[in-house]
Amino acid sequence: MSDSITNIFVISDSVGETGLSLITAGTVQFPNSKFNIRRFPLTKTISLLQGILNKAKRENAIILHTFVNPELSDYVNNFGKENNLHVIDALTGVVQTLAEITGEKPLNAAGLKHKLNPDYFKRIEALEFAVTYDDGKDPSGFLKADIVLLGVSRTSKTPLSLYLANQGYKVANLPLVPKTQIPKEIYQVDKKRIFGLTNDPEVLNNIRRQRMISYGLDPDTVYSNMDNINQELEFATNLYKELGCLQINVATKSIEETATLIIESLDSED
């Protein structure tokens, strides 16, 4: 694990949502690393692209792009080679392969996915919802959410919320801390929409120690203390039992696996 922050530029001649979703799915696999992701949408000219690439060079950023314009795509790829930058061309290979197999010439028109996909605006709304109601910022969100996630610190509440939001679900989450008052709204939510996240004490201890080290702090703190962690988990488990909600141990599960369990649970109740 590195203490440094990895800069990532997501560049697109459309809104950049495809690239952002892809890089988010990748970065959540590295919970002990720090990433600074910036999106540069509607980049449709070489002159505009040059300024962004020069900034990426100064910051030694990873570049992920989803250009459908071959000229812009080639420009970024060549810039990366010339300046020893890591460039991820997320779309060209897909389009070229489909063109070869179908024998059809691609339109090379930006944003067609969003124009043709009726779920696009639903997902954008869900992503905005997840950001607004992350970390228990506004308890009213629990009553509006499709899914409510509960969990102690470092149980992947936020990345899981964003992943589910990208599937179109409105998600609100609440961090659980012993001796703090649980918002009354939680008790008003249908238990079938609440999911209690937990983790193994040893896993939490390791994650929290590494987090302290990444900040240049002493890893042996109250935050990473095993007795404290066990108290937190006991507090969470008792609450889950009181609410009658589904409990999910995320210790050995990826974000995608946990999300699948949640979605399957929701679908089984419909």
From Swiss-Prot:
NCBIfam families: PRK05339.1
InterPro entries: Kinase-pyrophosphorylase, PPDK_reg
Transmembrane stretches, start-end: none
Record-level Gene Ontology MF annotations: ADP binding; ATP binding; phosphotransferase activity, phosphate group as acceptor; protein serine/threonine kinase activity
Alphabetical list of Pfam families matching this protein: Kinase-PPPase (PF03618)
Entry keywords, A to Z: Kinase, Nucleotide-binding, Serine/threonine-protein kinase, Transferase
Enzyme class: transferase
Residues involved in ADP binding: G151, V152, S153, R154, T155, S156, K157, T158
E.C. number(s) listed in UniProt: 2.7.11.32, 2.7.4.27
Swiss-Prot/TrEMBL catalytic activity: N(tele)-phospho-L-histidyl/L-threonyl-[pyruvate, phosphate dikinase] + ADP = N(tele)-phospho-L-histidyl/O-phospho-L-threonyl-[pyruvate, phosphate dikinase] + AMP + H(+); N(tele)-phospho-L-histidyl/O-phospho-L-threonyl-[pyruvate, phosphate dikinase] + phosphate + H(+) = N(tele)-phospho-L-histidyl/L-threonyl-[pyruvate, phosphate dikinase] + diphosphate
Protein name: Putative pyruvate, phosphate dikinase regulatory protein
Role noted for this protein: Bifunctional serine/threonine kinase and phosphorylase involved in the regulation of the pyruvate, phosphate dikinase (PPDK) by catalyzing its phosphorylation/dephosphorylation.
Provenance organism: Ligilactobacillus salivarius (strain UCC118)
Family to which the UniProt record says this protein belongs: Belongs to the pyruvate, phosphate/water dikinase regulatory protein family. PDRP subfamily.
Ranges in a coiled coil: none
